[in-house]
């Protein structure tokens, strides 16, 4: 087992996975069991995360030296800059902010 887990916790997780739900009530019960497993494995700090924050996805951003445009924005510490060069001429790439 990995650090912080016990055979009982692992067995509980295996039981949850092997007994897939057949209806909405069973799905709710399974969700509660999985939340208990998360709490046991990762601590109680996960149980305090609001539901909308836990399920929301962060917007994706382009990293350094990745092509960018008006739909694909650069990450916070980068800016979309037009480059000069050979085949990549007139394309924009994410570069570190100047100044």
UniProtKB/Swiss-Prot annotation:
It comes from the Eukaryota. GO terms for cellular component: extracellular region. InterPro entries: Toxin_22. Pfam families: Toxin_22. One of its GO terms (molecular function) is sodium channel inhibitor activity. The keyword Repressor does not apply. Expressed by the venom gland. Disulfide bonds join 61-75, 68-80, 74-94. Its main location: secreted. It is found in: Secreted. Keywords: Cleavage on pair of basic residues, Disulfide bond, Knottin, Neurotoxin, Secreted, Signal, Toxin. Inhibits voltage-gated sodium channels by binding to site 3. Insecticidal neurotoxin. The presence of a 'disulfide through disulfide knot' structurally defines this protein as a knottin. Belongs to the neurotoxin 14 (magi-1) family. 09 (magi-1) subfamily. This is Mu-hexatoxin-Mg1c. The lineage of its organism: Eukaryota, Metazoa, Ecdysozoa, Arthropoda, Chelicerata.
């Amino acid at each position: 087992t990995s650090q912080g887990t016990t055979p009982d916790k692992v067995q509980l997780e295996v039981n949850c996975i092997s007994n897939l739900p057949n209806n909405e009530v069973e799905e709710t019960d399974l969700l509660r069991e999985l939340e208990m497993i998360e709490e046991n494995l990762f601590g109680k700090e996960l149980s305090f995360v609001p539901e909308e924050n836990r399920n929301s996805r962060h917007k994706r951003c382009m990293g350094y030296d990745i092509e960018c445009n008006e739909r694909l924005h650069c990450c916070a510490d980068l800016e979309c800059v037009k480059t000069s060069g050979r085949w990549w001429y007139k394309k924009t790439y994410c570069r570190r902010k100047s100044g």
